[in-house]
Amino acid sequence: MSAPETTAPLQPPAAQAASLPGSLAESLASSGITELLAQLDRELIGLKPVKARIRDIAALLLVDKLRAARGFSAGAPSLHMCFTGNPGTGKTTVAMRMAQILHQLGYVRRGHLVAVTRDDLVGQYIGHTAPKTKEILKKALGGVLFIDEAYYLYRPENERDYGQEAIEILLQVMENNRDDLVVILAGYKDRMDRFFESNPGMSSRVAHHVDFPDYQLDELRQIADLMLAEMQYRFDDESRAVFADYLARRMAQPHFANARSVRNALDRARLRHASRLLDDAGTVADDRTLTTITASDLLASRVFSKAAPAAQTPAKE
């Protein structure tokens, strides 16, 4: 497999920033946005088109601030978004960073993220949905409302479903409070497309559609290294090769969830690592032993079992 395309750092190089007009360079330096974009670049492997869109939005808001300072006004841009992609591709993480960026650039007051699903918005009885939806919106004002699997709000097969009531309230707030609230709808691309086809009012209010691609094998290996480093673990040479084999097998099986499956696999490897140390009473508990995931901690996975081929039931991580 060829190496994935290298993602350029999100932050403008120092030389580029210095060449900008004085006020723009000063605004860039004082905004703190460079550090936030660099943090996102470190946290997320790959996702080049996603990072490019975030940088574009940050640039628009920064330039709008400069324009406003000089008396130019184009009105607040609509920044409601739709994030599409498979599980584990970083949608929630990007939404969290987006909230911080929007706050840093003065678009929203608080910069917090409120993440919800249908169950948080839609009631089971008459008169129950409106209060639930309005309470969530009240919490989200000044920040970002992230609605995961948003297409479940609309269930046309059930005439008595109250999801449409929640949608109508959302539409009103998205229009009237768009300078103090950003709504991000998330889910699988095909289902979100059908949702927008059935709800043209929602489609017309969402200006930015960002697709999160699945990770490639090498990117998943890098993600695993980052996750282990955060937990103060490491692979040795043998276990790193075994984990690459594990990923190749697991990616071919059902219900693979990108970075989420990587984290699950590492959590189970940590369990096996701990059990292995306790089972060997003579183990010397030095730093290397306590922090190194070995090949045996990975090979115990059912992914390597011939009894569970990829075409049949999904293996445990």
Curated annotation (Swiss-Prot):
- Gene Ontology MF annotations: ATP binding; ATP hydrolysis activity
Species, as recorded: Cupriavidus necator (strain ATCC 17699 / DSM 428 / KCTC 22496 / NCIMB 10442 / H16 / Stanier 337)
Q: Name one Pfam family in it.
A: AAA_lid_6
UniProt-listed Gene3D superfamilies: 1.10.8.60, P-loop containing nucleotide triphosphate hydrolases
Binding positions (ATP): G85, N86, P87, G88, T89, G90, K91, T92
Name the UniProt record assigns to this protein: Protein CbxX, plasmid
| Keywords, sorted A to Z | ATP-binding, Nucleotide-binding, Plasmid
> Per its UniProt record, what InterPro entries does this chain match?
AAA+_ATPase (IPR003593), AAA_lid_6 (IPR041627), ATPase_AAA_core (IPR003959), CbxX/CfqX_mono (IPR000470), CbxX/CfxQ (IPR000641), CbxX/CfxQ_RuBisCO_ESX (IPR050773), P-loop_NTPase (IPR027417)
What family is this?
A: Belongs to the CbxX/CfxQ family.
Show the NCBIfam families listed in the entry: cbbX_cfxQ (TIGR02880)
Job description of the protein? Seems to be necessary for the expression of RuBisCO.
